[in-house]
């Protein structure tokens, strides 16, 4: 699964150009999802030095991205809108459901891994 996440007021509690405190629950679940093999893309309007500062700050929090403001390489094409299964953004409709959705993805992946290769009798 590909998960796009915004930086300002999402990963960080501050708005551009500042970097505030980390959204610890969001970092924790994204780090777990990445460890399960999901792709995480930083999708932000930040550019240049502010973008690099955000990427470096996230790395210090333990989160490294598969791509920044572009598709993961295996998508095979470039588009202005990054292709993803889930978009996490402070301006998104239903933003209060982020953690529930991300935890559901994490638990579903754990379950699939647990039963991978197990044949079911019908």
Where are these regions (language model features)?
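Alpha-helical substrate-recognition element adjacent to the catalytic core
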Residues: 1-74
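C-terminal cap/substrate-recognition subdomain and adjoining C-terminal extension
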Residues: 51-122
